[in-house]
Amino acid sequence: MSPAYPRELGRAFEDDEVARKYRYRQPYPSEVFEILRGLLVEPHTVLDAGSGTGALTIGLAQFAKRVDAIDPSAAMLREARRMPGSDNERIRWIQGTAENAPLDPPYGLVTTGASLHWMDPEIVMPRFGEALAPGARVAIVDTDSIYGEQKWRGEFLTLIRAFSPIAHHITTPDFVKALEASGRFALEGQRSTAPVAVEQSVDEYMAMLASTSSLSRMTLGPRADEFDRQARAIFARHGMTGVRAKVVSGVTWGRPR
């Protein structure tokens, strides 16, 4: 088995507030879709597994013949249907898990956007393999926000470690290595996008954090208000009204086994 996040944390994504706050997550750079377009093969259909609110799905529908967007959360899919472009006739929104949702293969590409670590690779990787068209691949997409040496960052990370129930966040490279070691994935290629500068207000940044499984109000429970208070105090001490970062996305592709 490859590493995965504690499954109980995934319940946060069933919460309407978490789903609403997903809109504050930093978007994928446009270069991600250029990479995915280059990976798509006949019949030019895509399975977007763990689609969430459609951050990948809606972009994929600009060039794929059909995108089957699968997510277990009704709240996420409701929010997805509110997004601009979500009514594209090429998109089919499907509630279910990647392990057991109905599929309509063959697919010219399977994508997972920051979602594969919530799945059981012993089930989904063989399932993806069976659903892929000849020559098609699985693409694992993730995003990293780079804050550099900003003075507030170290203090803020200490605060996150004090409140987050996750002691160690699994990086995508580590996850892919574990998949390879398990024999469930044959790596073929990797690309990273050029950094894209983004800026959010403090309110937007806090809303983005509240959309995560580890720092949502649902997860933090009675500690949520105290986390919010201490976080905003850090920004106030540093005279900050906004948060700047550079966003880099990585696309890793290969064949499931």
Language model feature labels by segment:
Residues M1-E42, H44-G50:
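Conserved class I S-adenosyl-L-methionine
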Residues T53-N100:
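Class I SAM-dependent methyltransferase SAM/SAH-binding core
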Residues P102-V110:
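A short acidic, Gly/Pro-enriched loop at the edge of an enzyme's catalytic core
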Residues A114:
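Short catalytic micro-motifs in class I SAM-dependent methyltransferases
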Residues M119-F128:
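A short, conserved alpha-helix within the catalytic core of class I
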Residues G129, A133-V198:
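Conserved catalytic/acceptor-binding region of the Class I
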Residues K177-R257:
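Conserved Class I S-adenosyl-L-methionine
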